[in-house]
């Protein structure tokens, strides 16, 4: 993997910097590095593809070295270099695609394609010029079963989940009380509602709670907490739990009371915040517990009192909610996030070449399925293919 990264980095630099008119002295170190790559690769043969519709391709390396010059690089020099660069870029692209579409239930962190296995040989270590990528650093750590750490922006840690629970219901669904939520990506929104606006509740207060268990531990997380759940602020028709009918939800939004958020790790509370909104932090957690209350307003203008009558029918439904967004966090496992396109790159290649479903990843690389059942085998394979996708992205956009 280090060799593949160094190949890609060298080729990217060569493609960007070996251009007509450049002073040789400005790129002499790069050209020496490029020539070392050629010396190491010359005389070797590789084969890629042969899975799904990814075609089999054979690669042979026998390229002349780039020369020296006292002046600027001329058109002939650059053209000769470009021919070599383009062949190598095509080779790296195909090695990456070959690796991205393969998976294994055992030791999925290790190279799976014949080409990358061959590049992992001792003879190619002379190409190892650079090891500065976060993905490469973590791949090396994971392959030695040492602790890794990825920094994510808006990590896709929440599997998609949209549902509701009813704490009070009737066959006619005309006086409901309960909780509804939408979890996806790095955001969760939860709303508590009571058609009667807590008219018969103790102290005219309804208590709500929402607990989310993460599939992976997050550390040093920066989080935004808001006293609102905008996705549940407009009318909608909702299918009943048994699918036999539908019921109407017509929210009128109130501010939640006694909001408390707890971040837990293995059942132990690590951080607690009460009535604190905006930016908060959580040190180390695998579970989030949100609790909040709906308080019937003790004093109401006639217009508000008309919204919340003391008896049925209840045409407007008192609703309180919270929004929690994980803006950034560190995780030992690789995840899809807002800054990276690795999941999209891997999925696109697998779809384009009709790669058959393997023993590890779900069909279509369905992220909700993948993160819900994030097994050690999936973790190893995902880290490997994301690392390869990051290498490929240096050359192929």
Swiss-Prot record:
Organism's domain of life? Answer: Viruses
One of the record's GO molecular function terms: metal ion binding
Annotated spans, Interaction with the inner capsid protein VP2:
62-73
Q: Can you cite an annotated GO cellular component? A: viral intermediate capsid
Its keywords, alphabetically, are:
Calcium, Capsid protein, Intermediate capsid protein, Metal-binding, Ubl conjugation, Virion, Zinc
Indicate the quaternary assembly. Answer: Homotrimer. Interacts with the inner capsid protein VP2. Interacts with the outer capsid glycoprotein VP7. Interacts with the outer capsid protein VP5*.
Record family assignment = Belongs to the rotavirus VP6 family.
Q: What is this protein called?
A: Intermediate capsid protein VP6
Q: Please name the source species.
A: Rotavirus A (isolate RVA/Monkey/United States/TUCH/2003/G3P[24])
């Amino acid at each position: 993997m280090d060799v593949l990264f160094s190949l890609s980095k060298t080729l990217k630099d060569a493609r960007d910097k070996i251009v007509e008119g450049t002073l040789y002295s400005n790129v002499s170190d790069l050209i020496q590095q490029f020539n070392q790559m050629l010396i190491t690769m010359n005389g070797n043969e590789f084969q890629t593809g042969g899975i799904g519709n990814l075609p089999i391709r054979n690669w042979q390396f026998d390229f002349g070295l780039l020369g020296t010059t006292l002046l600027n690089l001329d058109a002939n020099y650059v053209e000769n270099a470009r021919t070599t660069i383009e062949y190598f870029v095509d080779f790296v692209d195909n090695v990456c695609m070959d690796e991205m579409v393969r998976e294994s239930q055992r030791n999925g962190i290790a190279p799976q394609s014949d080409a990358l296995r061959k590049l992992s040989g001792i003879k190619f270590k002379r190409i190892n010029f650079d090891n500065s990528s976060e993905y490469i650093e973590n791949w090396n750590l994971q392959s030695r079963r040492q602790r890794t750490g990825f920094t994510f922006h808006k990590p896709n840690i929440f599997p998609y989940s949209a549902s509701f629970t009813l704490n009070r219901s009737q066959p006619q669904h005309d006086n409901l009380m309960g909780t509804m939520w939408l979890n996806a990506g790095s955001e969760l929104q939860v709303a508590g509602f009571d058609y009667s606006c807590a008219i018969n509740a103790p102290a005219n207060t309804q208590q709500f709670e929402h607990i989310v268990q993460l599939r992976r531990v997050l550390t040093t997380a920066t989080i935004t907490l808001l006293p609102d759940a905008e996705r549940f602020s407009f009318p909608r028709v909702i299918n009943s739990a048994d699918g036999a009918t539908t019921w109407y939800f017509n929210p009128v939004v109130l501010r939640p009371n006694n909001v408390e958020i707890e971040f837990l790790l293995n059942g132990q509370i690590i951080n607690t915040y009460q009535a604190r909104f905006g930016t908060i932090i959580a040190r180390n957690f695998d579970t989030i517990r949100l609790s909040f209350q709906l308080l019937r307003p003790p004093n109401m203008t006639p217009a508000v009192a008309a919204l919340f009558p003391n008896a049925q029918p209840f045409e407007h439904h008192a609703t309180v909610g919270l929004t929690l967004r994980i803006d950034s966090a560190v995780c030992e496992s690789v995840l899809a996030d807002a800054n990276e396109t690795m999941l999209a790159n891997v999925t696109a290649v697998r779809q384009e070449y009709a790669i058959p479903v393997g023993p590890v990843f779900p069909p279509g690389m369905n992220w909700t399925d993948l993160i819900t059942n994030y097994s050690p085998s999936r973790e190893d394979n995902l880290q490997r293919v994301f690392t390869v996708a990051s290498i490929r992205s240096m050359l192929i956009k």
